[in-house]
Amino acid sequence: MKPENKIPVLTRLSDEMKAVVNFQQPGLPPWPADGDIETQRQYYLLERRFWNADAPSMTTRTCAVPTPYGDVTTRLYSPQPTSQATLYYLHGGGFILGNLDTHDRIMRLLARYTGCTVIGIDYSLSPQARYPQAIEETVAVCSYFSQHADEYSLNVEKIGFAGDSAGAMLALASALWLRDKHIRCGNVIAILLWYGLYGLQDSVSRRLFGGAWDGLTREDLDMYEKAYLRNDEDRESPWYCLFNNDLTRDVPPCFIASAEFDPLIDDSRLLHQTLQAHQQPCEYKMYPGTLHAFLHYSRMMTIADDALQDGARFFMARMKTPR
């Protein structure tokens, strides 16, 4: 699409979102567009430090979990000594960026608002690790903690998955993988999905939105996909293009959150409409005036905190509902 035909989203953002876009961190160098992947990962970690500051304090524990691909680092956030459920978190970053530190504040707030133990999974990044490794690592982590629950004071009778952006895809894909492969790790009571991508190759929102401000141009999205997938055939896999999976039955309740000016918003809309059409429990909420990745900015955006609390409320309600 000709760039001039795109919607000028920067003029339509909320005041909070504009403040974030215009905020300059002192001493932060520009994004290393021409740097290699390791340089970009280090920059992303540095840039996110400000946004992760002043997070709630709570007991945390790091654990290396054995998987078929080697040990995967996890971090357990325990807001209280006992927990009614366990929530696994998959971070975003286009499959190529991010770790437990870049999303630390999000996980701490989610633990605080749910009152549950949140386990962040530092899955292997692409292109070094290709589909479906991150999903299989996530499943291995769930299996490990289901077998060692007493050792970590976990309640794994009720579990959930949560994630933002690429992590949202991994969260839903992992839950479907457990269902499809008949792997028992606990009763999946809910999945919390913030502005994920779920398999669309093109859409109205992907044409109208996306630019240098969010790193989600068509070229960017193609790059993330090529880094993650092994080959072109993987695009149609039911655990990548989740719309090719069976969404008509036994899908855990989904909280589906989107950002108004996100190129990926149509993925969330289609997911919601598909689940709703087949009477699968779900809730959809769009956060006006926001860009993709707004969940990171709760230090400056009350709506980011609202989005986390909305997901937490959804999860807590499912803790009380027999399934």
Curated annotation (Swiss-Prot):
UniProt keyword list: Cytoplasm, Hydrolase, Serine esterase
Short motif Involved in the stabilization of the negatively charged intermediate by the formation of the oxyanion hole, span: 91-93
Major subcellular location class: cytoplasm
One GO molecular-function entry: carboxylic ester hydrolase activity
UniProt key word DNA-binding: no
EC number: 3.1.1.-
Annotated signal peptide: none
Subcellular location(s) per record: Cytoplasm
Gene Ontology cellular component annotations, sorted alphabetically: cytoplasm
InterPro entries from the UniProt entry: AB_hydrolase_3 (IPR013094), AB_hydrolase_fold (IPR029058), Acetyl_esterase (IPR023508), GDXG_lipolytic_enzyme (IPR050300), Lipase_GDXG_put_SER_AS (IPR033140)
Record has Nucleotide-binding as a keyword: no
Catalytic residues (UniProt): 165, 262, 292
PROSITE patterns: LIPASE_GDXG_SER
Function comment: Displays esterase activity towards short chain fatty esters (acyl chain length of up to 8 carbons). Able to hydrolyze triacetylglycerol (triacetin) and tributyrylglycerol (tributyrin), but not trioleylglycerol (triolein) or cholesterol oleate. Negatively regulates MalT activity by antagonizing maltotriose binding. Inhibits MelA galactosidase activity.
Recorded family membership: Belongs to the 'GDXG' lipolytic enzyme family.
Quaternary data: Homodimer. Interacts with MalT and MelA.
Protein name, per record: Acetyl esterase
Taxonomic source organism: Salmonella newport (strain SL254)
